[in-house]
Amino acid sequence: MDATDREILGELMRNGRISYRDLGAAVGLSANAAADRVRRLRRDGVITGFTATVDHGSAGRRLVALIDVRLAASGTNEEFEAETAKLEPVTDAVHVTGRFDYQLRVACRDTAELDRLLRHLKRDGGVAETDTRVVLRSAFTRGAS
């Protein structure tokens, strides 16, 4: 991956719907050359997909929270990941180092839905402990990772 590939990635993270013509112009390539580079980056697994950035508040999910999760000794990572992938409010789950095992980003309709989610995780999700923080605002978001 060279400097032009990094420029292409930056442009795509800012606007995943940019045309190849505009992308090429932004990085000093023809539309065809830009398209070839994007295809190669996808083939090589550097670009794993294109997603829409959703305003959860406009979608009726105004309460965004970060939940640190420590799994119960009896639970496995695979079981937890499979269970949380089914839960609509969970928008992101990352396996982390430190005192907790995972951090979840969730978008809930209200505190009642957040409470139900936390109870479900502890009852059926193999979770021993959680630490939850409500997001006041998002300073910025980069492209999907």
Q: Which residues does each PLM region occupy?
A:
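A compositional/biophysical signature of low hydrophobicity enriched in polar/charged and small residues
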Residues: 1-145
